[in-house]
A protein has these predicted regions:
Chain B
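N-terminal glycine-rich FAD/FM-binding segment characteristic of electron-transfer flavoproteins
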Residues: 1-296
Length: 433, 296
């Protein structure tokens, strides 16, 4: 019978963060991953936030496959097919080492991270799906069952890092099943372009990179956002919407993405690119209010499986790595103190999370999902209005500026009452303050 | 008994995906697998191991990532795995590959004498089917290609009987040991590794042999230098812009008639040639070839 201190289910950033930290501290760790190798099934934009990884592997920059460091962020509000109103922030300090954010390619990143996990001493077994949790008479989780023959494996604690679907925990009744209202579906393509072309089109050089976040009506009124990131010699472009909205509309995510790629603002940026890869993945975007119970007797949930995603800032992998690390550190401390992995002792994990940016950020934006679901015009109307207003002001046609401003205000009031506008402003401020 | 199985890591052509909207082929992210034909070879070797307690050693010549493919074989039940890897081996065609493998197998044979060597019928990325025969010739072993089944194996008498698919039928061949067998697809089905197998594969050391380990001194015979073949060009057949036509008719006979009419209309010379050919046949067989209805 195989028995470990800890079994980690899943080899994404959350599972790798946990397994690495545990193995480094000398615990015996088994990590199980259903993909052919770590990363084959995982999708991300992908922006890597250095801080979260640095706290796990301080010298990661020496070996980690990084694409570009980000020096500029653009925020674009776009309609379906004509306008784009944008803002950008470029900062020379973003080009001073150590860099804070990078673009990465997840397949390579996950492979690298997994190699570090193995080097740290964890046993990593791929192509093996965990089907259920094993429990003893008193309900404590004591291991996992895999789909392989003779597939029961035991451990003092199981960390569930199985990603957005969170099937293992749901099936075991540890957490409610995830609903379409709390889930976004995102599609993404990697488009190849020579490095010089990427550099020229985005006004960058060396390993500098640009990130573009896109909101507005490119999602055809559905709640969601798009993105365009620069890799070394490719671009990552994607769009995602709430699953419940997609179900209602007949548009497929691929059609949305094709629409985005045809938009006159995007098209010249990706012109002539060769598509290398496309993928689709779920993102749990229910936020703070949708968080499940995070620990119990002999188990903990980390990363996407717990719903640790900050949809407003498109942060997920950093919350995943951080929660994985914190779960691991909880176990390491308990083991050192000779204490069992009981629910009461594992509550320390939740307390650490509460004191960290993970919970603070999720709490801060807890009203955003509801706001945008209940007030869909926030996404559709305002971007269009902004576009119209900009066009009005920038078209020189002999009409006085004052008359133009009056027309713009009249347009806006025609779309929404003054009280409605005030209400929106208040709700917006509430949700993001 | 000691059995060696030569495998190769190849891109999984079944998982090369086509984009749903633009229909372009997605080359990235295609996982590497053990060449499917090699798995039939390995399973056959493992069945012999199950029956006789033989030792099974898998080996591959390839770049370092090919270790994954070897671990996969360990998970199924192979006892040892050897990765033969060296920069000088890259760019090898089948001649150079069989040279390296044969040298490594000779070294392996000195450690524990070999009775059987298996390879797959061919690889899915090269399709040449030349490496197995190349090994047999170089080692002077019996060669049994396109084997679908092993009927009998008598290690004591150093003899085996196999079924070999040949044009027009199945040959049953008896051979002496040691022999090289290239396995056909479909004769067996690879087992699903159990959990202890997965653990063993994750924990066991894969031996790494460079040119010295494989006992290779003559570097003119390996890698690009040892490879007389070069791929001059790769191209896909051009699709023809011809539309399918529909032939209608109430009965099969009517349809056949309409088809023949159409054929003769489209290819006028065909009718004349066919008639001339029939006349010629009739002349040769002096009436015997005449249709039955007419002779009656
Ligand atoms: C299009 C898109 C863009 C994104 N962009 C960003 C970004 O720019 N920056 C950012 O920080 N985040 C981004 N995210 C979010 C980020 O990808 C996730 O938050 C992060 O991957 C979560 O990590 P994880 O380890 O929890 O889950 P995952 O990365 O999903 O890993 C889970 C792993 O568990 C395995 N697994 C699942 N079930 C089982 C089972 N039963 N048995 C064994 N193994 C199992 C899976 O195969 C997988 O490897 C993006 C997400 C998407 C979809």
């Amino acid at each position: 019978m195989e028995k470990f201190d800890v079994i980690v289910v899943g080899a994404g950033p959350a599972g790798n963060g946990a397994a690495y930290t545990l193995a480094k501290a000398g615990l015996s760790v088994l990590q199980l991953e259903r993909g052919e190798s770590p990363g084959t099934k995982n999708v991300q934009g992908a922006i890597l936030y250095a801080d979260a990884l640095e706290k796990i592997i301080p010298d990661f920059r020496e070996t980690c496959p990084l694409e570009r460091h980000i020096i500029e962020q653009r925020m674009w509000l776009m309609d379906e097919d004509q306008t784009c109103t944008g803002m950008s922030y470029r900062d020379a300090r973003f080009s001073q080492e150590p860099y804070n954010r990078y673009t990465i390619i997840r397949a390579r990143f996950d492979r690298w991270f997994s190699d570090q996990v193995k080097k740290a001493g964890a046993l990593v077994v791929c192509e093996t799906t965990v089907t259920e949790l094993l429990r003893n008479g008193s309900g404590k989780v004591i291991g996992v069952r895999t789909e392989r023959e003779k597939g029961d494996i035991y451990a003092d604690c199981v960390i569930l890092a199985d990603g957005a679907n969170a099937l293992v925990g749901s099936r075991a009744g540890l957490r409610p099943e995830i609903t379409a209202d709390d889930m976004a579906l995102a599609v993404k393509e990697v488009l190849f372009l020579p490095k010089e072309t990427v550099d020229a089109r985005f006004n960058i050089s060396g390993t500098q990179g640009v990130v573009i976040e896109i909101a507005g009506n490119v999602t055809h009124g559905m709640l969601g956002t798009g993105f365009l990131y620069t890799n070394k010699d490719s671009l990552a472009i994607g769009i995602g919407c709430m699953l419940s909205d997609m179900k209602k509309q007949s548009l497929t995510p691929y059609q949305l993405l094709e629409g985005l790629k045809r938009h006159p603002t995007i098209k010249p940026l990706i012109e002539g690119a060769e598509m290398k890869e496309y993928s689709a993945h779920l993102i749990p975007e229910g936020g703070y209010k949708a968080l499940p119970q995070l620990y119990g007797d002999g188990w903990m949930i980390v990363g996407d499986a717990a719903g640790f995603v900050n949809a407003v800032h498109r942060e997920g992998s950093n919350l995943a790595m951080t929660s994985g690390r914190m779960a691991a550190e909880t176990l390491i401390a308990l083991k050192a103190a000779g204490k069992p992995y009981s629910a009461a002792n594992l509550a320390a994990y939740k307390r650490t999370l509460d004191d960290s940016f993970v919970m603070a950020d999720l709490k801060k934006y807890q009203d955003v999902p509801t706001l945008l679901t209940e007030q869909p015009h926030m996404l559709g109307m305002y971007p269009r209005f902004l576009g119209d207003a900009a066009r009005e002001l920038l078209t020189v046609d002999g009409v006085s500026k004052r008359a133009k401003q009056q027309k713009i205000m009249a347009d806006l009031k025609g779309k929404r009452s003054l009280l409605g506008l005030l209400g929106d402003a208040y709700r917006f401020w509430r949700a993001f303050r | 008994m000691h059995i060696a199985v030569c495998i190769k890591q190849v891109p999984d052509s079944a998982q090369i995906r086509v984009h749903p909207v633009t229909n372009t082929i997605m080359r990235q992210g295609v996982p590497a697998i053990v060449n499917p034909f090699d798995l039939f070879a390995l399973e056959e070797a493992l069945r012999i191991k199950d029956a006789t307690g033989a030792t099974v050693t898998v080996l591959t010549m390839g770049p370092p990532p090919a270790e994954e493919a070897l671990r996969k074989c360990l998970s199924f039940g192979a006892d040892h795995a050897i990765l033969i890897t060296d920069k000088v081996f890259s760019g090898a065609d089948t001649l150079a590959t069989s040279f390296v493998l044969a040298s490594a197998l000779r070294t392996l044979n000195e450690r524990q004498p070999l009775d059987l060597i298996f390879t797959g019928k061919q690889t899915i990325d090269g399709d040449t089917a030349q490496v197995g025969p190349g090994i047999a010739i170089r080692l002077g072993y019996q060669l049994l290609t396109y084997v679908s089944k092993i009927r009998e194996l008598d290690p004591a008498a150093r003899r085996l009987v196999v079924e070999r698919r040949a044009e027009g039928g199945v040959q049953v061949l008896q051979s002496a040991l040691p022999a090289v067998i290239t396995m056909l697809e479909g004769g067996n089905e690879m087992r699903f590794a159990d959990m202890p197998g997965m653990f063993r594969a994750a924990r066991q050391e894969v031996e790494i042999w460079n040119r010295d380990g494989a006992g290779i001194t003559d570097l003119t015979q390996v890698g690009l230098k040892g490879s007389p073949t070069a791929v001059a060009q790769v191209f896909g057949p051009k699709p023809k812009a011809v539309k399918a036509q529909r032939i209608e008719g109430a009965t099969p006979a009517e349809m056949a008639e309409a088809f023949v009419d159409k054929l003769f209309a489209d290819f006028p010379q065909l009718e004349g040639e066919l008639l001339a050919h029939l006349d010629q046949l009739a002349g040769q067989d002096s009436g015997l070839a005449a249709p039955q209805g007419e002779s009656a």
